[in-house]
Structure formats: structure tokens, C-alpha cells
């Protein structure tokens, strides 16, 4: 029985789609670790600490969810956390090929680590952090796509970034 799962991502910022998958993973596994990646190849709008804090706020009502920032290989982080499952989201068919390659690479690096794929609720299937930031950057209302605290933090972050 798999009891510890990791849902990894950049979460820049966490969206309602992410939150939906976290809620469902929390029902499937005894303990869910949200692994927030410090990915040097991406240039996140929020710092790692800010992303950890936002995800903590959004998931505070879930007793079996823990939020941890990490850097390095995901398989090494999973081993450190004693997790045997990776939870990944599939929004569309276009996500499948990349996720399939990633799952196979992770399996090659850590044969005992399983990947489990969840699809978001239909109303969240098109939401991505990138699209949310783009809408917010152009002054659009993102409150239907993210938690209210995330919308507030994103508005403040963008206001500070304007010249």
C-alpha cells in the first residue's frame, strides 16, 4: 500500500487546478507532500519561500498535506521523503507525451517510484500558472482561477514589478 505521495511542481502560482488535484490526492494517500521545485531553468515570478507560503495557505485545511521546497532531482527528493508515488496532473492530451517521457525517466532512475496521473475537474482543465500570470499581467481578473490570497499576492507582485 502506497501511503506517501509527492505532487511536484513549480506552483508559480498555485492555481485552482493544482488545488483540485491536491484535494483528490489527499483522499487517495495517507500523506501528500507538495514538492515545490526551485527550478533554475525557469524564472518564477514568486520566490521559493513565497510559493511555499501560498501553497501552505491554500492547503491549510488538509491535515495530511505537507508543503516542502526542494532543489535537485525529483527522484532524490522522493527518496528523502520516503515517498513511493509521484502524483502528476494531465490537463490535455498535449501533456501526455511529456509526462510519459518523464515517468519513464523517473522509473529508470528510481524503479520503485510509481507515477499516478490525475486529470483536473473540467472547469479547471485549461488553467495553467502561465496563463494566470499572463491574464493578471494585462489587468484581467484571475479570481476565478486562483484562491483569493493568491490573486491578492499576484496583484501585489505585478504592481511592484511595474516600472
Swiss-Prot record:
GO biological process: coenzyme A biosynthetic process
EC number from the UniProt entry: 2.7.7.3
GO molecular function, one term: pantetheine-phosphate adenylyltransferase activity
Pathway noted in the entry: Cofactor biosynthesis; coenzyme A biosynthesis; CoA from (R)-pantothenate: step 4/5
GO cellular component terms attached to this protein's record: cytoplasm
Residues reported in the UniProt entry to bind substrate: 10, 42, 74, 88
Site feature (Transition state stabilizer) residues: 18
Record function comment: Reversibly transfers an adenylyl group from ATP to 4'-phosphopantetheine, yielding dephospho-CoA (dPCoA) and pyrophosphate.
NCBIfam families: coaD_prev_kdtB (TIGR01510), cyt_tran_rel (TIGR00125)
Assembly notes: Homohexamer.
Protein known as: Phosphopantetheine adenylyltransferase
Organism: Shewanella baltica (strain OS195)
Name of the gene: coaD
